[in-house]
From Swiss-Prot:
This is Alanine--tRNA ligase. PANTHER family: ALANINE--TRNA LIGASE, CYTOPLASMIC (PTHR11777:SF9), ALANYL-TRNA SYNTHETASE (PTHR11777). It is found in: Cytoplasm. Its cofactor is Zn(2+). Consists of three domains; the N-terminal catalytic domain, the editing domain and the C-terminal C-Ala domain. The editing domain removes incorrectly charged amino acids, while the C-Ala domain, along with tRNA(Ala), serves as a bridge to cooperatively bring together the editing and aminoacylation centers thus stimulating deacylation of misacylated tRNAs.
C-alpha cells in the first residue's frame, strides 16, 4: 500500500470507527487543566482524567489523530530536529483507546489486522517484530498463539532502566497512578540498513523502527510502589503518523514522505535555496508545523513558558533561513503551503491563517534586527575560544541581550564541532530567575494542590439558592473533617448553585449557612468534577456531612450574566466588522466589566470600534431571546457554533444562541434576553501581543455610570471655559487659538531676551592664541534658548568658540558652538564631553555644535574654568 499521509490518517480513523470507536477530534496543543504539561505530547493527554476516573465519556472506545509538540520540558526533541531521520517538534499521534472496554486480546488483534490486512495497510508480516514486558505472558501468548508471530520475532524486555518496572516496555503516568506493561511493534527496513532488533546492542540503529506502542493500563501504582489491579483495565495506543507514512511510502526518513517533500520544496522556494539536501530545509519544514499550530491554538511568542518555547522554535527557523541565504522575511510565507499539505487536519489553522502569518512575520521582523549583531558577537567569541566549549556566561549574554535561545547558540557551535556550557548557562539563568522571584513576592497557593474525588451537581442555571450537603473540606490544601470560625478553607458540596470559574467567567460569591455556622464564599473554583467554595468561616463550626443553604450573591451574579452575554455579541460583531479570521483568544467576565482578547493583526480604527459598539447595541435593542440547547459536540460544530479558546468540552455540549446573530458553545450563566444587557460601551482597545488585540467594555449599570461620568466631565470642562455643553467645542477651540497666540508672543519675547543677552555677552569674549573664546554661566535662561543664543553669538563674533551653561532644578545644561573655520582644531563634541564628565553627565553632537547635561551643579564653575586651558592646549 502506498498512500498519501492524509489518506493514511483517514484510513486509521476509518478502521477503528468500523470497530465501534468514536472518532474524537484532536485536542489543543495547549493542555486543558493540566499544569504539569507544557504541550500536548501524546494522544492520551485529552483522556487523562478519564483514565484517572475523574471524568466520564459517553463512549468507551475512541480513536484520534492528535497534534503533538515535543520541544521544551521532559520531552524535548528540538536540538535533534533536522539532524536525524525521525525527530520532530510537531507530529501527529494516531491512537485508539479503550476505557474499561476491550483489553489485550482485542488491542493486539486490531493492530495486527490494520497493519497486515490487504484491505488496510498490507505490510509484510515477516517484516514486523514485537516486544512485550518480560513478565507479561498474556500478551506474549496472544502474539504467539493467536496472531501467529514466530517466537524469534517476539522479544521480552525487562527492567532496563535501573529499577523495578523501569523499562521501555512498562508505561506509567507518574510516580503513582495508572500504569502497566506495553507491547511495541517494530518494522524491519532490511539488512541494507545498519541496526539490530530491540533489546540488542545495535538497537539504536535505523533498521528496526518502532511504529506502534500499545499500553495496557492494568495497575494503580501506590506511593509505596505496590501495584494494585485496576477494576477496569484500559488501553492506550500511539502510532506516529509520520513514521507509518515513511514505512508505507517505502522511504527510510520521515523527511522523505510526501508531506515533507512538498514542504521542503516550499521552503526552498521562499528562501532561494538550491541545495535540496540541506539540513536547514528540514529544520524549517518541521518548525513551520509546530509554530503555525501553536499560534493557532493560542500560544503567542514571549519570554515565558509556552510562549518562550514557541519563540525559540521560530528563531531557530529564522536562523536556518539566514544560513540558506534568505534576504527577507520568509517564514510566514510557509503557512499557506502547510495548510495545503495538511488537508482536513488544518481546517482550524486555515480559519486563522491571516493571524498566524502576521504573528510569524512580526516575530521575524523583530528578531532580524538583532540576529546579525548577535551572530557577529558569537563569531567574535568563538574566534577567541581556546578550548571546545563556549562558556555559559557568553551564551546567557546572547540570550539576554540579543534574544538568542541557548539551543540556537548550540546549533551554531555544533556546526563548528564545539559545545556550549549549558550548566553555566543554567546557573546564569537561575540567578536571573532568583532575582525575579525575590522581587515578585508570590506566595504558595495551597488551593491549587487540592484533588477532589467526589463530584458536585451544578444547579446554577435555574437556581441561586440550594439546600446541599458538605462532602469535603480543605484547609491549606489538606482534607479535614471540620473547620472553625476564622479559618480559610474550601468547601465542597454535593450540589450547588455557585458557578465555578471557567470559560473566562469568574466564580460566584455568596454564603453557605446553617443554624450554627456561616461560611463567606469569596470565590468558586472547579476541582475536576467537584465545585469548591473558597472563603472563610465567619461563625460557628462546619463539618463534613453538615447540611447548608447555599446562597449566591444575586446582584453580583446578574451583572456577570449581562457581561458574559455581551462578550458573545461582541465576538459576533467583531467577526462581522473585521472578518472571519477573528477568534477568541481569552476573556475575563466579572461583575464590573468584561475583557475580550481576539486574533487581529492591527489596531482597530476608531470608526471600526464605533461600528462594533453600534452593532452590539443594535442586537441589544432587538431584545432577542438567549436560548440554550444541549447537543452532541459534532452536531454543534455543524450548526456553526464557535468554541471557546482553551476550553475542554464534553461530548454533550451546551449551545448558546442569540437569535440569528450569535451561536457559541458555552457553559456560563447568561441573560434571558439580549435586552436585559441594556447598554454596551467600549472602554479601550489595545494590543497584548503580536496578532492579539484586547477590548474592555462595560454593560448595563456600568455603561450608564460611564455615561454619567463622561457627562459630568463635559459639564466641568464647559464651566472652566465659561460655556455649556452645546457650544463646548467652539469654546475649547477659542481657548486653544488664544493659547497658541500667547505662546507665539511669549516666544517672541524670549527671542528678544536671548538676542539682548547675546549682545551683552559678545563683549566678554577672550582671545586665546588669537582665537575668540566665550564661556558663560547664565541665570534665568531656559535650556532650549541656549542654541538660539549660540547661533546669534556666532554671527556677532564671526570666528569663535562658545560655551554656555545654565542650571534648572539641580540639573546642568551645556552647549558648545564652534564656527566652521575652527572645527579642524577644536571639535564641539570633544570639548563638551570633557566638560560634561566633570559635572556628572555626558553628551555629544556635531563638530560645530554639541549639547550635554549633568547632575552636579556645584561642580559647574570649576568645569567652565577648565575650558580655557583645554582650548589653549589645542590651538
Amino acid at each position: 500500500m502506498s498512500k498519501s499521509t492524509a489518506e493514511i490518517r483517514q484510513a486509521f480513523l476509518d478502521f477503528f470507527h468500523s470497530k465501534g470507536h468514536q472518532v474524537v477530534s484532536s485536542s489543543s496543543l495547549v493542555p486543558n487543566n493540566d499544569p504539569t504539561l507544557l504541550f500536548t505530547n501524546a494522544g492520551m493527554n485529552q483522556f487523562k482524567d478519564v483514565f484517572l476516573g475523574l471524568d466520564k465519556r459517553a463512549y468507551s472506545r475512541a480513536t484520534t489523530s492528535q497534534r503533538c509538540v515535543r520541544a521544551g520540558g521532559k520531552h524535548n526533541d528540538l536540538e535533534n530536529v533536522g539532524y536525524t531521520a525521525r525527530h520532530h517538534t510537531f507530529f501527529e499521534m494516531l491512537g485508539n483507546f479503550s476505557f474499561g472496554d476491550y483489553f489485550k486480546h482485542d488491542a493486539i488483534n486490531f493492530a495486527w489486522e490494520l497493519l497486515t490486512s490487504e484491505q488496510w495497510f498490507n505490510l509484510p508480516k515477516e517484516k514486523l517484530w514485537v516486544t512485550v514486558y518480560e513478565t507479561d505472558d498474556e500478551a506474549y501468548n496472544i502474539w504467539a498463539n493467536e496472531v501467529g508471530v514466530p517466537h524469534e520475532r517476539i522479544i521480552r524486555i525487562g527492567d532496563n532502566k535501573g529499577g523495578a518496572f523501569a523499562s521501555d516496555n512498562f508505561w506509567q503516568m507518574g510516580d503513582t497512578g495508572p500504569c502497566g506493561p506495553c507491547s511495541e511493534i517494530f518494522f524491519d527496513h532490511g539488512d541494507h540498513i545498519w541496526g539490530g532488533p530491540p533489546g540488542s546492542a545495535e538497537e539504536d540503529g535505523d533498521r528496526y523502527i518502532e511504529i506502534w506502542n500499545i499500553v495496557f493500563m492494568q495497575f494503580n501504582r501506590q506511593s509505596d510502589g505496590t501495584m494494585l489491579p485496576l477494576p477496569k483495565p484500559s488501553v492506550d495506543t500511539g502510532m506516529g503518523l509520520e513514521r507509518i507514512a515513511a514505512v508505507l511510502q517505502h522511504v527510510n526518513s520521515n523527511y522523505e514522505i510526501d508531506l515533507f517533500r512538498d514542504l521542503i520544496a516550499a521552503v526552498a522556494d521562499v528562501t532561494g535555496a538550491t541545495d535540496l539536501s540541506s539540513k536547514s530545509l528540514r529544520v524549517i519544514a518541521d518548525h513551520i508545523r509546530s509554530c503555525a499550530f501553536l499560534i493557532s491554538d493560542g500560544v503567542i511568542p514571549s519570554n515565558e513558558n509556552r510562549g518562550y518555547v514557541l519563540r525559540r522554535i521560530i528563531r531557530r527557523a529564522i536562523r536556518h533561513g539566514n544560513m540558506l541565504g534568505a534576504k527577507e522575511t520568509f517564514f510566514y510565507k510557509l503557512v499557506a503551503p502547510l495548510i495545503a499539505v495538511m488537508g482536513p487536519a488544518a481546517a482550524e489553522l486555515k480559519q486563522q491563517q491571516a493571524m498566524v502569518e502576521q504573528v510569524l512575520k512580526t516575530e521575524e521582523e523583530q528578531f532580524a534586527r538583532t540576529l546579525e549583531r548577535g551572530l557577529a558577537l558569537l563569531d567574535d567569541e568563538l574566534s577567541k575560544l581556546t578550548g571546545d566549549t563556549l562558556d555559559g556566561e557568553t551564551a546567557f549574554r546572547l540570550y539576554d541581550t540579543y534574544g538568542f535561545p541557548v539551543d540556537l547558540t548550540a546549533d551554531v557551535c555544533r556546526e563548528r564541532n564545539l559545545k556550549v556550557d549549558e550548566a553555566g548557562f543554567e546557573q546564569a539563568m537561575e540567578a536571573q530567575r532568583r532575582r525575579a522571584r525575590e522581587s515578585s513576592g508570590f506566595g504558595a497557593d495551597y488551593n491549587s494542590l487540592i484533588r477532589v474525588d467526589s463530584a458536585s451537581q451544578f444547579s446554577g442555571y435555574d437556581h441561586v439558592q440550594q439546600h446541599a450537603t458538605v462532602t469535603a473540606l480543605f484547609r491549606n490544601g489538606e482534607a479535614v473533617d471540620e473547620i472553625h470560625a476564622g479559618e480559610e478553607a474550601v468547601v465542597v458540596l454535593n450540589r450547588t448553585p455557585f458557578y465555578g470559574e471557567s470559560g473566562g467567567q469568574v466564580g460566584d460569591k455568596g454564603e453557605l449557612k446553617n443554624a450554627t455556622a456561616t461560611f463567606s464564599v469569596t470565590d468558586t473554583q472547579k476541582y475536576g468534577q467537584a465545585i469548591g467554595h473558597v472563603g472563610i468561616l465567619t461563625t460557628g463550626t462546619l463539618r463534613v456531612n453538615h447540611s447548608v443553604e447555599a446562597l449566591v450573591d444575586v446582584v453580583r451574579r446578574n451583572r456577570i450574566r449581562l457581561n458574559h452575554s455581551a462578550t458573545h455579541l461582541l465576538h459576533a460583531a467583531l467577526r462581522n466588522v473585521l472578518g472571519e479570521h477573528v477568534a477568541q483568544k481569552g476573556s475575563l467576565v466579572n461583575d464590573k466589566y468584561l475583557r475580550f482578547d481576539f486574533s487581529h493583526f492591527e489596531a482597530m480604527k476608531p470608526e471600526q470600534i464605533r461600528l462594533v459598539e453600534d452593532l452590539v447595541n443594535e442586537q441589544i435593542r432587538r431584545n432577542m431571546p438567549v436560548q440554550t440547547e444541549v447537543m452532541e459536540l459534532d452536531a454543534a460544530k455543524e450548526k456553526g457554533a464557535m468554541a471557546l479558546f482553551g476550553e475542554k468540552y464534553d461530548d454533550q455540549v451546551r449551545v448558546l444562541t442569540m437569535g440569528d446573530f450569535s451561536t457559541e458553545l458555552c457553559g456560563g450563566t447568561h441573560a434571558s434576553r439580549t435586552g436585559d444587557i441594556g447598554l454596551f460601551r467600549i472602554l479601550t482597545e489595545s494590543g497584548t501581543a503580536a496578532g492579539i488585540r484586547r477590548i474592555e467594555a462595560v454593560t448595563g449599570e456600568g455603561a450608564i455610570a460611564l455615561l454619567h461620568q463622561q457627562s459630568d466631565l463635559l459639564q466641568d470642562v464647559a464651566h472652566l471655559v465659561k460655556g455649556d455643553i452645546h457650544n463646548l467645542a467652539d469654546k475649547v477651540r477659542a481657548v486653544l487659538d488664544r493659547s497658541k497666540m500667547l505662546e507665539r508672543e511669549l516666544q517672541q519675547l524670549k527671542d528678544q531676551q536671548a538676542a539682548q543677552e547675546s549682545a551683552s555677552l559678545s563683549s566678554s569674549a577672550k582671545l586665546i592664541n588669537g582665537v575668540k573664546l566665550l564661556v558663560s554661566q547664565l541665570d534665568n535662561v531656559e535650556p532650549k534658548m541656549l542654541r538660539t543664543m549660540v547661533d546669534d553669538l556666532k554671527n556677532q563674533l564671526g570666528s569663535a568658540i562658545i560655551v554656555l551653561a545654565t542650571t534648572t532644578d539641580d540639573k546642568v545644561s551645556l552647549i558648545v558652538g564652534v564656527t566652521k573655520d575652527l572645527t579642524g582644531k577644536v571639535k564641539a563634541g570633544e570639548l563638551i564631553a570633557d566638560i560634561a564628565q566633570q559635572v556628572g553627565g555626558k553628551g555629544g553632537g556635531r563638530p560645530d555644535m554639541a549639547q550635554a547635561g549633568g547632575t552636579d551643579v556645584q561642580a559647574l564653575p570649576a568645569a567652565l574654568a577648565s575650558v580655557e586651558a583645554w582650548v589653549a592646549s589645542r590651538m
